[in-house]
């Protein structure tokens, strides 16, 4: 699960929590409660501008309502008005410094802006104020992943799982951490557990990537990619990875090529046949030279004989 996907879920849970908290307002705060509840309803319908107006009305009715500031901050954050959201969260912390929610929401906003170091301070404070709440610990794990602090991230997601052993997202995130630490078998085990609790195409894709890229287990990787595409057929990245894995498996299983025969050497000049022919030619030449030489010697004798006085 990506950080943005988780944060959107966390925002919904937060809004529902605030709605329940404001349902029983203290005496004399009915106007504040009414505006807050109406604002939460509008925010849940993604009507953030209208929700902000309701939360602002609640603040006008009671400038000390930390919840109104928190809710207005979350609505502004949904509109990506991060600086204004931060100001509202800071005001909520000023009003209620012992309430973890202001630190939690500001820390979450820091994570969304990839300001991980700043996020750690707020999320650590939120976890300190409410140790049993896993949201702050989980978000701190996200920040630690962003900083590449793998050991601390693994510890935080382990802490989440100790409180809730059926948290599929915590298994997925810890699996990602293990993979980043090159603990591939541990990563696979966490992905397995996450999928056992809640099948998710993103987790199938991550497990498939781990099988193919790091373990060269193409068969299992292909199966995971195919499962991802059954759930989400338009996942282009997974389509490309599936094709790569199939090509790699085909290359791995291809039969070895037949050995190329060594070339037959060309016969050399000094073969028995060539030597025999050379000897015959040599003998013939010797014979010819001998005959010619004999003939020349006889002619000279005849010339000398014919020149004598008889």
Regions found by a protein language model. Give the residues of each.
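Register position in tetratricopeptide repeats
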Residues: 44-45, 78-79, 112-113, 139, ...
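Residue-level recognition of tetratricopeptide repeat
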Residues: 40, 74, 108, 142, ...
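Helix-start (N-cap) detector for alpha-helical repeat units in TPR-like alpha-solenoids
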Residues: 32-33, 66-67, 100-101, 134-135, ...
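Conserved structural position within tetratricopeptide repeats
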Residues: 53, 57-60, 91-94, 125-128, ...
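Cytoplasmic C-terminal tails of single-pass
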Residues: 297-310
